[in-house]
Amino acid sequence: MFELNNFDALQIGLASTEKIREWSRGEVKKPETINYRTLKPERDGLFCERIFGPQKDWECHCGKYKRIRYKGIVCDRCGVEVTKAKVRRERMGHIELAAPVSHIWYFKGIPSRMGLILDMSPRALEKVLYFASYVVLDPKETQLLKKQLLTEKEYREAVDKYGEQNFVASMGAESVKKLLEEIDLEQLSLVLKEDLKNSTGQKKIRIIRRLEVVESFRKSGNRPEWMVIDVIPVIPPDLRPMVQLDGGRFATSDLNDLYRRVINRNNRLKKLLDLGAPDIIVRNEKRMLQEAVDALIDNGRRGRPVTGPGNRPLKSLSDMLKGKQGRFRQNLLGKRVDYSGRSVIVVGPELKMYQCGLPKEMALELFKPFVMKKLVERGLAHNIKSAKRMVERVQAQVWDVLEEVISDHPVLLNRAPTLHRLGIQAFQPVLVEGRAIKLHPLSCTAYNADFDGDQMAVHVPLSVEAQSEARFLMLAAHNILKPSDGKPVVVPTQDMVLGSYYLTVEREGAKGEGRYFSFPDEVIMAYQLKQIDINAKIKVKMTKIIDGKYISGIIDATAGKIIFNECVPQDLGFIDRSKPGNEFKLEIDFLVAKKNLGKIINKCYMKHGATKTSIMLDKIKARGYHYSTISGITVSTSDMEVPEAKKRLLSESDAAVDKIEKMYRRGFISEDERYQRVIERWTKTTEDVADELMNNLDKFNPIFMMADSGARGSKSQIKQLAGMRGLMANPSGKIIELPIRASFREGLDVLEYFISTHGARKGNADTALKTADSGYLTRRLVDVSQDVIVREEDCGTYEGYDVSEIKEGNEVIESLSERLTGRYSAEDIIDPNNHQIIVPKNSYMDSKLADRIEASGIKKVKIRSVFTCKSRHGVCSKCYGMNMATAQKIDIGESVGIIAAQSIGEPGTQLTMRTFHTGGVAGSDITQGLPRVEELFEARKPKGLAIVSEVSGTVKMEETKKKRSVSVITDNGEEVTYDIPFGSRIKVSNGDLISAGDEVTEGSVNPHDILRIKGVQGVKNYLLSEVQKVYRLQGVDINDKHLEVVIRQMTRKIKIEESGDTELLPGTMIDIFDFEEENARVEASGGSAAQGRVALLGITKAALATESFLSAASFQETTRVLTDAAIKGKIDPLLGLKENVIIGKLIPAGTGMTRYRSIKINTENEVQENQLEA
């Protein structure tokens, strides 16, 4: 049986006149919509019931047939079929045009498809189509040329010269249609291919462009004359509705106005033709008809747009698809869903990690159908209707039933903006009073939520499958690691950190110091009886059973550490238990700040898994809150003391700056140097004052404790509170050399305050701009990588990718072990010291193995990488390696593309926006932060270009008065010289050995140059390490594999250079796999293969060049993508996520993959158990 939703691919093409008539249920002849008195549709008008179906279910226009029993009858009086009103959403009509018109997409798009196939310029075409010039269709015996343009005057002269019968020339779309009909695609294709062999330069480019269009038509079976329309389809009336507003007026869709103009002009043209009106009038009417149809299809593409009331351009068919409010993005990719609600969130510290508090009334509304069913099952209501009444009146029994319904029904909580997959998690609901949703404090980091009025949305998974997915895959207690770097995302913050810090800090000379206790419980009892201080150093006898024997030993501890260790499993590996004497030590015997908490959680997760970790986290949360309250840590002005040495330091600096000024005035140093020295001096002073301040602070100073524990604030903020604020930047980013001497404790004077406002305002403006930019970057990343899914276990490639540590100067940005963890080796890794194999080929490397490899002194390792994966669609499990979010090997079906895009996009808002100025030297500004990431992913030519050596060799420097130059002398004596522009800093020195692709001057390199010099692997390496540098400098960790996924998508296309015996055209882009396939096919039959080179596309370009036209059209440039796809008759194989969301199928990832589809969830046993219990 043919099912409407059961298809594997989708094809788009041009519609022929016959096809449009086939779709249609009748011709729309009148421009009328509905009768103003009866409010019923006019017959043969734009809302006609005879064409489009009845307005009311099972009721004809005249009212002769009402009720379902007349289903399918066509009324003999009014001609309306008795059927459901829903057909008005699917039945189409048509308008028979009195004269053909061209379709604006194919004539006006860039490049003009109509112009290319006819070999006419778009300008000339426009003149013909809009009745400004004649075009010669058949010159016969005359000296005119075919397709030659004639103005009115030239036409008359030609008629006088040759006579009207001796040649054929006409204007308008009819003449263009005739020319298109005459085209023999097969013949034209052969002619163009011949011409291509003998042409060069611009001519060659033009022929390739023409050939592309001709081949598209030839292969797709579309005919060129279908670009000219004889019949216009009218879309169903319910898709362009007309509704009555209160006050008797009507609101209508713009499309109705546009259709009405077409019908009016068409009818007038018919009438004029019947009357045999003069040519000039008919011509004008035809031109107006052409313009009306243009406006309907794409208003504003040519000339001024047609406007409605208030000078607003009308929304045409193209506008309905485009942009954020268009059909694709508004209705197909993002729908509003039922069974959802939203409310303000408040903190719920009493909740377990997997719970959330749901307000009673909200829960009742969300779970209404479930509650009603249960009420009927229980016999509390006789039927669904009375159950509904009970729920609406909120009777007492309803609450008990609701409790039972939600007891094992997880809900999804989402906070906008959802920047990564942790922005939607599942929780077990707990009913709460009030109207606010309660959120577990540890889930805040993942959601980036706080309780200053944030709102969250709740969604109810309905089907059993959806519920089990929510419970097993999305439960908050399972989402402990961050998918971007595999570090814990649920790290306690603020009060919890402060509490843990307070528990594990030791105080010298506290009450009870040095006392001995015989077991831990005795310590806690002593603390509760106020015998000892919680931070006092004490000795405790610990007893353990080892090999069936009781063994005891005495350890150093504090009451706080004992309390804290009760929360934590004692086998995490912080203490080496194999050493004698270590058996009794507390696992956490150090000061617990925020950093260490992350380590504790990581170790617990690796050792014990998610469930135990979430239990430990809940315990730490409870203790943290309790003891941070008891500690009584508060903030007061007196906690901040201005260091005594500040005065002395300031006056010393003043003297030093005076000295620098004197030197400048005497001409010993330049202005730049003076500025640099003053800045350096004040920076040092600020740091000295800060050091003095930090050294004077007591270890138990509350503000110090907050900063030191990582609960809130930082050293630099303390420095500003009581040290000095230091140097500030002016609005352009240049540092002002007058420092702010005061601290906030002392108070700023007017000038200082004014200088500070620059930075504060710039910060706010930056944040607002950054959010939008970062969001747009994420959207492009998602679009380019959304169809990358793990589709197989092993692609069987022999290639690998060499990794070594990434350095910026002397600083290691990413160590080798970090880059190896969770990857597969591409070859045997051999220890250089004893020549034994550490890791065999194709084996998985965990963090222990990675550390061992690094320790053995190996500098470079070949690993399996997404870069070299040979999977045609998506990647294979071995090339990808570990799933960062679970620390396990990745499962087949995981949508790693989306995860990669989110991991790169989510921290985008933390990157800076600024361009650093290097003391006013023009041309040497380096782009950093977000703009730099964007520049790399879009493969743009960067600002501040560095000069790159094209060859390998030895450096020779020359400097004359007029210019500086650097030469590179190759091994065979060739010399390549580069002139260095003024103001650039040279990176190499005389006699250096450099290799091709190395930078000669400082700055950023154009990635296309690297592709040319170092090849594909070189450019992939460059992009990866450059993006990593930007993120790491901001303190953001992203695993390499996410960047690899995106960069692989940027280098998937090949630009054909020589076509050989293949069907491929030079200059066109084709997927690497298609390229290899086509070459293999040709070589098998003895032909010569095509030549091409890998092209580097920016993410926007790469997203638009995807196989799927649905995905590309829903991304950007909708009309261009669809025009191109229609001419090529493209088939969308529906492999990515986006396409499947658009057509409403399950996405082919995760449990939606075909290999998992047949899994059934068995609920029978549960049902039986429940019945037995009842």
From Swiss-Prot:
Disulfide bonds: none annotated. Gene3D superfamilies: 1.10.132.30, 1.10.150.390, 1.10.1790.20, 1.10.40.90, 2.40.40.20, 2.40.50.100, RNA polymerase II, clamp domain (4.10.860.120), RNA polymerase Rpb1, domain 3 (1.10.274.100). Zn(2+) 1 binds at C60, C62, C75, C78. It holds the Pfam family RNA_pol_Rpb1_3. One of its GO terms (biological process) is DNA-templated transcription. The keyword rRNA processing does not apply. Mg(2+) binds at D450, D452, D454. Zn(2+) 2 binds at C795, C869, C876, C879. The keyword Transcription applies. It comes from the Bacteria. Binds 1 Mg(2+) ion per subunit. Keywords: DNA-directed RNA polymerase, Magnesium, Metal-binding, Nucleotidyltransferase, Transcription, Transferase, Zinc. CDD domains: RNAP_beta'_C, RNAP_beta'_N. GO terms for cellular component: DNA-directed RNA polymerase complex. GO terms for molecular function: DNA binding; DNA-directed RNA polymerase activity; magnesium ion binding; zinc ion binding. Its cofactor is Mg(2+); Zn(2+). It catalyses: RNA(n) + a ribonucleoside 5'-triphosphate = RNA(n+1) + diphosphate. Its EC number is 2.7.7.6. DNA-dependent RNA polymerase catalyzes the transcription of DNA into RNA using the four ribonucleoside triphosphates as substrates. The RNAP catalytic core consists of 2 alpha, 1 beta, 1 beta' and 1 omega subunit. When a sigma factor is associated with the core the holoenzyme is formed, which can initiate transcription. Belongs to the RNA polymerase beta' chain family. This is DNA-directed RNA polymerase subunit beta'. The gene is rpoC.
